From Swiss-Prot:
Subcellular location: Cytoplasm
One cellular component (GO) term of this entry: cytoplasm
Database matches in Pfam families: OTCace, OTCace_N
Protein name: Ornithine carbamoyltransferase
Gene of this entry: argF
Coiled coil: none
Major enzyme class: transferase
Pathway(s) the chain acts in: Amino-acid biosynthesis; L-arginine biosynthesis; L-arginine from L-ornithine and carbamoyl phosphate: step 1/3
Length: 304
């Protein structure tokens, strides 16, 4: 059982994961799901929240974590992913990997024989979205029927958000400049889920106000990630400011709307200090919930 994207999860699966996460949040060291298990944590790019939350999750679940930074090992450098996957499968019980290319994760699942969890790739960020859904549920007491508004680059986080929100029956609005839309495959999958369930909707627009109007949740991410070297920075700084979450944009949303950002944030760019530090911001709850959601993911993986 692997978790590379959310596409193979049904609503009941996510509901179970969120319920388990709520339990783990109330009972920090309650279960030894990973007793006598070793988890390899592989990082091809810098990480704060992902690394710390997974490390703590493994240890609080009774397991042992082994962190492998690619700059210090042969992983993704001098050794093929195929060989790395086969060798690690002899040593560890789970592979958690934060990678630059999603294909690396697919190779781990193809050539290894232990569960693989996507801690972030260029295509998807499923664990972040499970933490996001947990945060929304905590603050709104439901998911189905909410208007979820995303602003900015249609990146890996956006891809996973539209999938997760579609599964949970939410109305998804994505405001992004032309040419920066989310991955078409994920948009199609989200629409198929919506059609099948007969609940929710998805709208991709370049109009931030349409996106923000009467929204229950406003969400943004960095306009340019640390690993994205293909974007024209000057162009980004020119065309993205209308998608900044600021007090004016927030005024179009519902009065009790919450504001989210997966962090790290470039304050003054995709979001202002006033908003991220304001009463409607839940970014630190969101960050904390990475720990609890990821514990629930381990439980889900080993219950299959």
């Amino acid at each position: 059982m692997h978790l590379l994207t959310l596409e193979n999860l049904e609503r009941k699966d996510i509901e179970n994961i969120l319920n388990d996460a709520i339990y783990f949040k109330k009972n920090r060291k309650s279960e030894n799901i990973l007793k006598e298990k070793t988890v390899a944590l592989i990082f091809e790019s810098p990480s704060t929240r992902t690394r710390i939350s997974f490390d703590i999750a493994v240890n609080e679940l009774g397991g042992h974590s082994l962190t492998l930074n690619t700059g210090e090992t042969h992983v993704s450098k001098k050794e093929s992913t195929k060989d790395t996957a086969k060798v690690l499968s002899r040593f560890v019980d789970v592979i958690v990997a934060r990678v630059k290319e999603h294909s690396t994760l697919e190779d781990f699942t193809k050539y290894g024989n232990v569960p693989v969890i996507n801690a972030l790739s260029d295509l998807s960020h499923p664990c972040q979205i499970l933490a996001d859904l947990l945060t929304i549920k905590e603050h709104k007491n439901k998911l189905s029927g909410l208007k979820f508004a995303y602003f900015g680059d249609g990146n890996n986080v956006c891809n996973s958000l539209i999938l997760g929100c579609a599964i949970m029956g939410m109305d998804i609005f994505v405001a992004t400049p032309e040419g920066y839309e989310p991955n078409e495959k994920f948009v199609k999958m989200a629409q198929q889920i919506i059609d099948k369930q007969g609940e929710g909707s998805i709208t991709i627009t370049d109009d931030a106000i349409i996106c923000a109007k009467d929204a229950d949740v406003l969400y943004t991410d960095v306009w340019v990630s640390m690993s994205d070297k293909n974007k024209n920075i000057d162009e980004v700084l020119k065309i993205f400011p209308p998608y900044q979450i600021n007090e004016k944009l927030l005024s179009y949303a519902k009065k009790d709307a919450i504001v989210m950002h997966c962090l790290p944030a470039n304050r003054g760019m995709e979001i202002t200090d006033e908003v991220i530090d304001g009463e409607q911001s839940v970014v630190y709850d969101e960050a904390e919930n990475r720990l609890h959601a990821q514990k629930a993911v381990f439980k889900y993986i080993f219950s299959k």
